[in-house]
Regions:
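Surface-exposed, low-hydrophobicity beta-strand/loop segments enriched in small/polar/acidic residues
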Residues: 1-123
Length: 123
C-alpha cells in the first residue's frame, strides 16, 4: 500500500540533548531540563512529542514529526490498526484503549516483532 504525504505533517526542529544517532524513528519527548531540546522516551508513562526523523549527535538539530504519517521503530509485534504507545526504549508498542498510558497514534502496517520499522499515523 502506498501512502501519500500531502504536506499536512507537522515537523519541528529541536536540539538533541544526547547523541541520538542510533534513535532514528524512535519516540522523543521534551527534555524538561533544557529548553528547546529532546531526549528519547524512557518510560511507558512518557508523553511523546513526536518521532525522530533524523540521526543527530548531541547538540545537533533533531527533526521531529509531531503529527502525520511516518515510519516508526517497534518494541514488539504490532498489528495493523493497533493503537500505539511507547515502551521504555522509545519504540512503539500496542497500547490498549483502557490503559492509562498515552496513546500516540495508530499502526498502518504490521510488525512481527521488536526492531522492525512500520508506517503509522501519529497524532
Amino acid at each position: 500500500m502506498a501512502y501519500q504525504y500531502d504536506g499536512s505533517a507537522i515537523v519541528i526542529t529541536q536540539t538533541a540533548t544526547a547523541d541520538l544517532s542510533a534513535s532514528q524513528y524512535e519516540l522523543v519527548m521534551c527534555d524538561t531540563a533544557n529548553d528547546s531540546s529532546v531526549v528519547v522516551c524512557a518510560a511507558v508513562t512518557d508523553t511523546p512529542l513526536g518521532v525522530l526523523l533524523n540521526k543527530p549527535g548531541a547538540g545537533e538539530a533533531a527533526t521531529v514529526l509531531c503529527a502525520g504519517v511516518t515510519k516508526v521503530a517497534t518494541g514488539a509485534a504490532v498489528a495493523n490498526g493497533a493503537l500505539l504507545g511507547v515502551d521504555a526504549t522509545g519504540r512503539v508498542v500496542t497500547q490498549a484503549p483502557a490503559n492509562v498510558n498515552p496513546v500516540f497514534g495508530q499502526a498502518l502496517t504490521t510488525s512481527g516483532g521488536a526492531g522492525e520499522i512500520i508506517t503509522a499515523a501519529i497524532n
